Each structure stands twice: as C-alpha cells, then as structure tokens.
Amino acid sequence: MDMPEDQAGGPTAKMYLWDQAEDRSLGTLLSLEEQILNSTFEACDPQRTGTVAVTHLLAYLEAVTGRGPQDARLQTLACSLDPSGEGPQATVDLDTFLVVMRDWITACQLDGGLELEEETAFEGALTSQQLPSGCPEVEDPANLESFGGEDPRPELPATADLLSSLEDLELSNRRLAGENAKLQRSVETAEEGSARLGEEISALRKQLRSTQQALQLARGVDEELEDLKTLAKSLEEQNRSLLAQARHTEKEQQRLVAEMETLQEENGKLLAERDGVKRRSEELASEKDILKRQLYECEHLICQRDAILSERTRHAESLTKTLEEYRATTQELRLEISHLEEQLSQTQEGLDELSEGAQVRRVDCTNLLPPSLGVELQAIQQRNLQEESAHPQEGREEPSTRLPRREEEDGAEIQVMVDLPLHPEDSHPGDILGNPPESSPSEPELQQALVPMVKELVPVRRPVWGQLCLWPLHLRRLRVTRHLLIPAPLLGLLLLLLLSVLLLGQSPPPTWPHLQLCYLQPPPV
C-alpha cells in the first residue's frame, strides 16, 4: 500500500527511516508488511513493554477495519492470539503477534475479498501512527471519521455524495493497487538486492574477519619473523663462535695428533725397553736361581768347611801340645848335648893318641848297628868325602867339632819335618793343606764366580817302621859332624835322638773328604 505524498516527510516517514537505519545497523531488512505489523504492535504498546493484551489488539483492528466483534475472521484471529482461552488476561508478544498475523493474512488472502479491508486497515494504521501514543480517541469508533476511517453507523442523508466519493475512492484504490503491485515488485527486487547485499555484507564481514585473522596471523608471522631474525643473528654469532672453536679444536687436535705420534714412538721405545728389561729380568732371575743354588751349595760347603776347620783346630791344638812336649824334650837333649860337647872338648886332646883304637872301635860299632843305619852312615861318609874333594879350600878350614846352635837346630828340625818322604801313592801335599790347584790355561772361563771343588776320599797309609828309616836321598840336609874322632856310641845316640824326633813329629794326613772353593774369576759385587 502506498502512503500519501503529503505524509512522506511526516513523523511516520521519519520513524520508518529511523527503523530502517536501526535495522541496517543490525543487519536485518524488514518488508513492508512487517513494518505495518510492527507499527500496529507499537501503537497498541505505547509503554514499550514487549507484550500487549489480546483484547486491546482486537479492539484496535476492529476500529481500523470497521468490522464488528462478530466477524468470523476477527474471531479466528482472536482464537489464534488466545488459543488457551484466557480471555481479558491473555497477552501476546511481538514475535507471536507477527507469526499469527502472517498466518491470518495468508488465510484471508486465500479466501479473497480482503483487499479493501487491507487498504482500509493500512490507511487506518498509517493514520493512527500520526496520532500521539496512548490517545484514547483512536480507540473510539466515533472519532475514526476524522482520521480517515468510516463510521459503521447508518448512513446520513448525504448518500449520493458519499457514493460518488466512494467511486472515486475505488478508482483511486485500483490505481493505488496497481502502484502498490509495482511497489511490491520493486520492494521484492529491493528485498532481493538487500538479501544479496546482506549476503555480500556477510561475505565481506567473513572476508573482513578472515582478513583480520590473516592480518593478525601476518602480525604474528611478522613477530615470529623478527624473533627468527634475532634468533638467526644469535645463531650466526653462535656459528662464528663455533667456527672459531672448531678451528681452535682442529689446531688442538693436530697438536694432540703430533703428541700422540710422539707418545706412540716413546711407547714403542718403552715397549722395546720393556722387552729388553723383561729379558734382562728373566736372565737375572735365572742367574739369581743359579746364584741361589750356588749360595746354597756354598753355605753347605761352608758348613762342611767349618766342621773341617773345627776338626783341624782341635787337631792343631793337639799338635801344639805335642810340639810343646817335643820342645821340652829337645831342650833337655840340647842340655845333654852341650854337656857332651864340653866333655868332648875336654877329651879332644887325647883323641890323637887313641885314633887307631878309635877307628877299630868305630868299625865295630858300625857293625853292631842295624844294616840300614850302617848303610846310611856309610852313605853320609862317602858324601862328606866327595864334598871335601869337591871343595878342597873349605876342607882346609878348621872342621867344626860342634853341632849348630839352637837356631840352626830349630831350622834343621823344621827342614827334616818338611823333607820327610811320603808314600808314592799318597795325594799331593796341596790336597792335604787345602790349597786350590792351579787351573790350566786351556780350560774355558766359566760364568760362575765360585765353583765347588769336591775331591774323592784319599786313601792314607800309615807309615811302616821300615820306611821311616833314614832314606839316603832325603837326608842330605841333616848336619852331622865330619870329625872322624867322634865316638861311635855318641854318634849312635845322636842318630837315635834324631829318629825319635822325626817319628814323633810326623803327623798323620787327614782321612776325610777334602772340600775346597776355587775362585775362577773375581767374585761379583
């Protein structure tokens, strides 16, 4: 339905424009029908409570459409608005009112004959919007005539004028219906455009949201990029430091490789030295074992030598005692010899006269001696004669009629003891005395310092009395006076004395095994 031209700039237009601006701000475009229904609800709800009584709405529609309460359509609308039948207490909100009114208008359009009523209702609604809210005159049917409504009361006498005006109104109504259809089509196109615009706006809003999200994401990416730049700078610095450290580590590694090579060379030398030391230690161990065995043998030999030395010490002590006894005996014999020398010196003067008788007596004494002693004496005399013939000048000297003094006698005793004959089967004197034999130069030098020399048992034979007689080859050192006038008994006494000294001074050789240590080279330090 079109609004009058004079009312285009009125409060209704302003309210409509304001509602449109508010709807645009909310993003919702309303149709003309919804605008009329909203204006009807707002006219019935001046306090803006959001709920309106059903009776109030029905009274307003009755006043606008000119229908009575008995109208079937209004009763249907009342039943739709008050399905529970609450009566005057029934209320309805805007959403329910809009839904019920849309359904009611659709049902009336299907039944037909609602165009005039709608036009009248729309004109009344638009006219009622110009009135102040809450005006009681709007609800009064008597005052509807002044606002463009019709009085349902019976017509007055000016019927002809009313019919003519009614025809004019019908013509204008038809004209306005065509214009209304055009406007509805334009409204539909506008609604379609607004729907498209809404879709575009929603798409733009979505795009704006996506753009904002992309912008926020870009900002986040930018911040992350800045962080990555700072991180890259720090990583570059770390890379530089790591490169420097790597170069330093490489130099250190080269130095360590050189040190390792030197250490390997030293290790090889040390291994060679260790092998040499090991071999040397093995050699020393073997030498140590050999020396241990030698030491054990030497200790054993030393023990045996100690036993031998103790035995020899005891034997030497016994010989010392015997020697003292012999010395005492020889002292007594020397005294007797000196006494006899004095007697001989006294009787020397009368010896010339009795030389012949002495010769005879001497021959007799010689015959009386044992055969061995006689042979000895004859050998001595022959040797003395040979010495006198060999040394005539010495024979001219005065023959000593005295025996040697005490020193010469001691030397003679020692000489006789040394020159005593031994049995041809006896061992070497060095074996008895314990002297080491000289090593032959052909023998190879041995590595050992001490070599035990163990000799076998030496069979010793006791001297026979027949062998202890004066042997002519070993008695050349005996000093006997060459005076031919010595009495034979005195000479025999002297010979017996010498024989007793020789027999008593002879010591038996040892009969135990002879042990000896022979140094073949200087002992080790």
From Swiss-Prot:
GO terms for molecular function: dynein complex binding. The chain crosses the membrane at residues 484-504. It is found in: Nucleus outer membrane; Nucleus; Chromosome, Telomere; Nucleus envelope. Residues 385-408 have a biased composition (Basic and acidic residues). Residues 505-525 are perinuclear space. Residues 1-483 are cytoplasmic. Keywords: Chromosome, Coiled coil, Meiosis, Membrane, Nucleus, Telomere, Transmembrane, Transmembrane helix. One of its GO terms (biological process) is chromosome localization to nuclear envelope involved in homologous chromosome segregation. Residues 164-360 form a coiled coil. Residues 127-156, 384-409, 423-444 are annotated as: Disordered. It is a single-pass type IV membrane protein. Its main location: nucleus. It comes from the Eukaryota. One of its GO terms (cellular component) is meiotic spindle pole. Pfam families: EF-hand_9 (PF14658), KASH_CCD (PF14662). As a component of the LINC (LInker of Nucleoskeleton and Cytoskeleton) complex, involved in the connection between the nuclear lamina and the cytoskeleton. The nucleocytoplasmic interactions established by the LINC complex play an important role in the transmission of mechanical forces across the nuclear envelope and in nuclear movement and positioning. Required for telomere attachment to nuclear envelope in the prophase of meiosis and for rapid telomere prophase movements implicating a SUN1/2:KASH5 LINC complex in which SUN1 and SUN2 seem to act at least partial redundantly. The C-terminal 22 AA is required and sufficient for localization to telomeres at the nuclear envelope. Core component the LINC complex which is composed of inner nuclear membrane SUN domain-containing proteins coupled to outer nuclear membrane KASH domain-containing nesprins. SUN and KASH domain-containing proteins seem to bind each other promiscuously; however, differentially expression of LINC complex constituents is giving rise to specific assemblies. At least SUN1/2-containing core LINC complexes are proposed to be hexameric composed of three protomers of each KASH and SUN domain-containing protein. This is Protein KASH5. It comes from Bos taurus. The gene is KASH5.
